[in-house]
Amino acid sequence: MSHLLTMSELSEVEISEILKDAEDFANGKESKTTEQTFVANLFFENSTRTRFSFEVAEKRLGLDVLNFSADASSVQKGETLYDTIRTLESIGTKAVVIRHEQDRYFDELKDQVNIPILNAGDGCGNHPTQCLLDLLTIKQEFGRFEGLKIAIVGDVRHSRVARSNAEALTKLGATIYFASPEEWKDEDNTFGTYKPLDELVPEVDVMMLLRVQHERHDHYETDIMKEYHEKHGLTVEREKRMKEGSIIMHPAPVNRDVEIASELVECERSRIFKQMENGVYVRMAVLKRALPNVLGGMKHELFV
């Protein structure tokens, strides 16, 4: 069964095939089911980009979308996530997309349910589809991963994006650096080396900024965020020192003038909105992988 839970479960060849399918969709290839197929989106945390991106992807593939509201469901009555998924499975749902605040919520589910789970983010753990859309964006820009230098900057400890990207990009041959306030370092993430931000600015090919996750911190004050921007954010002055041809990425939502100066969000180097566009194509590709009997399957030459 084609769950997509973490990047570590994907081989280089599988990553390549997903990216090639996504690239085909980006280039206008169509793939629609001719039979009624239900897919459920279960979001237990707030989301704009991931939720709507999945919904657009599902509808482009001709799937029937069930949008689950936790507040209006039997979860409020104490129903377990397992029972919720089994209920959806019993009434004919063929796959579930889940975002959940619990790290690795899927560990006890993956061998108990009979439909694919697509992880749309688990707590501070993993975010595989965000990683895949980031990989697609980098691939489109540079044509390769091998030899690239990539800085992942900010709240590394609480970031599922940092965890997924560092692991996958290392597997694909890139060199990963982290820049972070001391209290937000993740010593368990062994896929990169910590260096001061100002040393990395002129060296790296990709500046991947992370959102300051104020919902996971006790203190979120304007003066603290101003200090963060000056010490750890991509200021206009830092952007001027970036190497020629390098790009800026951010998983969004963006805290303007915190992680990045507002005027840089749509600057020439920025690929932030391109990432969002690519999110639809990548999610079409992972849905296609999860539902091969409905949407068919394609094999490709290695794309990495």
From Swiss-Prot:
Pathways per UniProt: Pyrimidine metabolism; UMP biosynthesis via de novo pathway; (S)-dihydroorotate from bicarbonate: step 2/3
Positions of carbamoyl phosphate binding: 49-50, 99, 127, 130, 252-253
InterPro entries: Asp/Orn_carbamoyltranf_P-bd, Asp/Orn_carbamoylTrfase, Asp/Orn_carbamoylTrfase_sf, Asp_carbamoyltransf, Asp_carbamoyltransf_Asp/Orn-bd
UniProt keyword list: Pyrimidine biosynthesis, Transferase
Gene Ontology BP terms: 'de novo' pyrimidine nucleobase biosynthetic process; 'de novo' UMP biosynthetic process; amino acid metabolic process
Binding site residues for L-aspartate: 77, 160, 211
GO CC term (a single one): cytosol
Domain of life from the UniProt record: Bacteria
Catalytic activity, EC: 2.1.3.2
Keyword presence, Lyase: no
Catalytic activity, as annotated: carbamoyl phosphate + L-aspartate = N-carbamoyl-L-aspartate + phosphate + H(+)
Any one GO molecular-function label of the UniProt entry: amino acid binding
Stated role: Catalyzes the condensation of carbamoyl phosphate and aspartate to form carbamoyl aspartate and inorganic phosphate, the committed step in the de novo pyrimidine nucleotide biosynthesis pathway.
Subunit text: Heterododecamer (2C3:3R2) of six catalytic PyrB chains organized as two trimers (C3), and six regulatory PyrI chains organized as three dimers (R2).
Family designation: Belongs to the aspartate/ornithine carbamoyltransferase superfamily. ATCase family.
Protein name, UniProt field: Aspartate carbamoyltransferase catalytic subunit
